[in-house]
């Protein structure tokens, strides 16, 4: 277990909840072996060492994600409500607030490319339609004059 100083625990004033133990991502990254396996799912830290041999998908799957944020992989598999409930028994703390990734709502709007991509999405078909219209008119006019 990490010391409060190493983990950035809420007990020393660095986290927002004094009842929760906070772990830095560097601390979690060190726990990536079969002897000590931690992972992060939705900002929460789990010590799944005891669960490795019981995992239905095999321990290799878990070891690939060990010491890292496994949220995307966990959700991609589509775990059952029972599996999500079982996960609670391996909970040991939260990722330190300074290490959490910003949520989608926290992104800088000036870096949002959705407007640019929507223009590209519409401009190509419009230019194509205009070009086809000119070509059609040109050839239709030529066939009428012949």
From Swiss-Prot:
Cytochrome b5 is a membrane-bound hemoprotein functioning as an electron carrier for several membrane-bound oxygenases. Residues 1-11 form a propeptide. Component of a complex composed of cytochrome b5, NADH-cytochrome b5 reductase (CYB5R3) and MTARC2. Pfam families: Cyt-b5. Keywords: Acetylation, Electron transport, Heme, Iron, Membrane, Metal-binding, Mitochondrion, Mitochondrion outer membrane, Phosphoprotein, Transmembrane, Transmembrane helix, Transport. Belongs to the cytochrome b5 family. This is Cytochrome b5 type B. The chain crosses the membrane at residues 119-136. It is found in: Mitochondrion outer membrane. The modification N6-acetyllysine is found at residue 30. One of its GO terms (molecular function) is metal ion binding. The modification Phosphoserine is found at residue 80. Heme binds at residues 55, 79. GO terms for cellular component: intracellular membrane-bounded organelle; mitochondrial outer membrane; nitric-oxide synthase complex. Residues 20-96 form the Cytochrome b5 heme-binding domain. The keyword Nucleotidyltransferase does not apply. It comes from the Eukaryota. GO terms for biological process: nitric oxide biosynthetic process.
